[in-house]
């Protein structure tokens, strides 16, 4: 029998129109055939590889922290192309168009030789070697079994390019719920936090991306360079799904590590193995079978295992730096357009991680007068240096001042329209104005003390390595290394042809 029955499944309907859609920059930006080469000076930085060095009072920073495991975030300031006096004024119409920069190529130069740098802690929480144990050790021999331990960090090469700062992620302490037990010694809840990666922020060296200051209160579980820091890792998932794609045009990375040694922590385990818990036999013998009375294994040892990582071989065969990268299509909607005339380059490279050891004689006299070596008469210092050089290929692009284009730019960043001076120009006021002679006297009205408000920098609270390229642009691409590479790969190099000359042969005389 044929009867009507209710539908058992859900019906999916299309979204109601209109649907908001973000256009790609390629849909409304017109690219010209004018290219510029931009380059920076040799960028150098020197400091201590593990911590900041202050004076005796702790008020003056004498030596900054400069580590090979830090992020270097360059904020490149580009000139305003709308202020350029172009030789060909037919390139764009200033009444209907505006000019912007498009990044087409980049080369991040690194100086200094390859080298491996070590890090460590003089009081490292390492109780026992669990890779090759000699005897079963159930507990620490004293209340403090920390050791002086060092290791080489995870090897990492990475750079991220965008017109907005790179977004990082790390784990942080989260707030407890109102009804949770907040007894001392309980493990806190943790949450994933997004933040801007700034110049000097530590990268992950093999111990995770978390706030070690708040989550490791023993101050002995990691090395000195990160024990009081927050290690960040770029949030590639968030940047790849960004609706505008400003934080990451493209990136390149190479990471490698392996576990070199295997240790166990000291201290009380916060989470007992379920086999130890009195739970009416629920977990009996699920994880281990108890040892007999009188055996050393009767008191089970600590289970807080961890490795010390190693970055392994550093080789010039796998370098991301000192080579050009060309941008044809970005991963997001922004295909290399440098909004607000700026570019952010986030770099991590610890393949040039050599830490200099500098020894200084502390006594009066010369080193040549020493008869016997005495270690107490020498003071040892450590320094780390870094060397960078950045080159860019910029393409001149123009934006039509149409309603739909301006609407999207206004929704994305309204300050861009203010820089382009697109506001309505009001009619001039009455030309006759009042001017007081003795404006500072008590007899006249108080002058306006409110200074005109300057445009606020949205990235003022953050720390970057500012590089001014406003006077470092050139049209002579063939005069620079990256420019010649760009001309060659784009097929714009003029091939010189050899001139051939026809030589007329002389007539041969007949013998008579």
UniProtKB/Swiss-Prot annotation:
SUPFAM superfamilies: Group I dsDNA viruses. Gene3D superfamilies: Major capsid L1 (late) superfamily, Papillomavirus. GO terms for cellular component: host cell nucleus; T=7 icosahedral viral capsid. Its main location: virion. Signal peptide: none annotated. GO terms for molecular function: structural molecule activity. Coiled coil: none annotated. It is found in: Virion; Host nucleus. Keywords: Capsid protein, Disulfide bond, Host nucleus, Host-virus interaction, Late protein, T=7 icosahedral capsid protein, Viral attachment to host cell, Viral penetration into host cytoplasm, Virion, Virus endocytosis by host, Virus entry into host cell. One of its GO terms (biological process) is endocytosis involved in viral entry into host cell. Belongs to the papillomaviridae L1 protein family. HAMAP family: PPV_L1. Forms an icosahedral capsid with a T=7 symmetry and a 50 nm diameter. The capsid is composed of 72 pentamers linked to each other by disulfide bonds and associated with L2 proteins. Binds to heparan sulfate proteoglycans on cell surface of basal layer keratinocytes to provide initial virion attachment. This binding mediates a conformational change in the virus capsid that facilitates efficient infection. The virion enters the host cell via endocytosis. During virus trafficking, L1 protein dissociates from the viral DNA and the genomic DNA is released to the host nucleus. Self-assembles into homopentamers. The capsid has an icosahedral symmetry and consists of 72 capsomers, with each capsomer being a pentamer of L1. Interacts with the minor capsid protein L2; this interaction is necessary for viral genome encapsidation. Interacts with protein E2; this interaction enhances E2-dependent replication and transcription activation. This is Major capsid protein L1. It comes from Human papillomavirus 24. The gene is L1.
């Amino acid at each position: 029998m044929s009867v009507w029955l209710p539908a058992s499944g859900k019906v999916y309907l299309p979204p109601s129109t209109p649907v908001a859609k973000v256009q790609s920059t390629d849909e409304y930006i017109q690219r010209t055939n004018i290219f510029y080469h931009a380059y920076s000076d040799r960028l150098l930085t020197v400091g201590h590889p593990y911590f900041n060095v202050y004076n005796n009072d702790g008020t003056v920073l004498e030596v900054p922290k400069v580590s090979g495991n830090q992020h270097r975030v360059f904020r490149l300031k580009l000139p305003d192309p709308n202020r350029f006096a172009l030789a060909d004024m037919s390139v764009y119409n200033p009444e209907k168009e505006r000019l912007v920069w498009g990044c087409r190529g980049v080369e991040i130069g690194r100086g200094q030789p390859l080298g491996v740098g070590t890090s460590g802690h003089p009081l490292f929480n390492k109780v026992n070697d669990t890779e090759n144990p000699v005897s079963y050790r159930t507990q620490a021999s004293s209340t403090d079994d920390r050791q002086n331990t060092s290791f080489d960090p995870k090897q990492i090469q990475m750079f991220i390019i965008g017109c907005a700062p790179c977004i990082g992620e790390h784990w942080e302490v989260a707030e407890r719920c109102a009804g949770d037990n907040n007894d001392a010694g309980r493990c806190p809840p943790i949450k994933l936090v997004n933040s801007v990666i700034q110049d000097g922020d530590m990268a992950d060296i093999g111990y995770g991306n978390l706030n070690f200051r708040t989550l490791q209160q023993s101050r002995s579980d990691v090395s000195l360079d990160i024990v009081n820091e927050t290690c960040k890792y770029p949030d590639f998932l968030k940047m790849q799904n960004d609706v505008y794609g400003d934080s990451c045009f493209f990136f390149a990375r190479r990471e490698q590590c392996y576990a070199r040694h295997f240790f166990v922590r000291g201290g009380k385990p916060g989470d007992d193995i379920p086999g130890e818990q009195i739970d009416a036999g629920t977990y009996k013998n699920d994880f281990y079978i108890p040892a007999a009375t009188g055996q050393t294994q009767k008191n089970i040892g600590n289970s807080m295992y961890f490795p010390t990582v190693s970055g392994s071989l550093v080789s010039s065969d796998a370098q991301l730096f000192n080579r050009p990268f060309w941008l044809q299509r970005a991963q997001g909607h922004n295909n290399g357009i440098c909004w607000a005339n700026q570019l952010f380059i986030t770099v991590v490279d610890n393949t040039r991680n050599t830490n200099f050891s500098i020894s200084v004689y502390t006594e009066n006299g010369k080193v040549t007068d020493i008869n016997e070596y005495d270690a107490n008469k020498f003071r040892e210092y450590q320094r780390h240096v870094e060397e960078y050089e950045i080159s860019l290929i910029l393409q001149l692009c123009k934006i039509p001042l149409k309603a739909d284009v301006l609407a999207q730019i206004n929704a994305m960043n309204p300050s861009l329209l203010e820089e382009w001076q697109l506001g309505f120009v009001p009619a001039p006021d009455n030309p006759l104005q009042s001017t007081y002679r003795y404006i500072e006297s008590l007899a006249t009205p108080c002058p306006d003390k409110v200074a005109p408000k300057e445009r606020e920098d949205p990235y003022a609270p953050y720390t970057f390595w500012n590089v001014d390229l406003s006077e470092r642009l050139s049209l002579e691409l063939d005069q620079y290394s990256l420019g010649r590479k760009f001309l060659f790969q784009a097929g714009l190099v003029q091939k010189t042809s050899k001139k051939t000359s026809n030589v007329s042969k002389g007539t041969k005389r007949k013998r008579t």
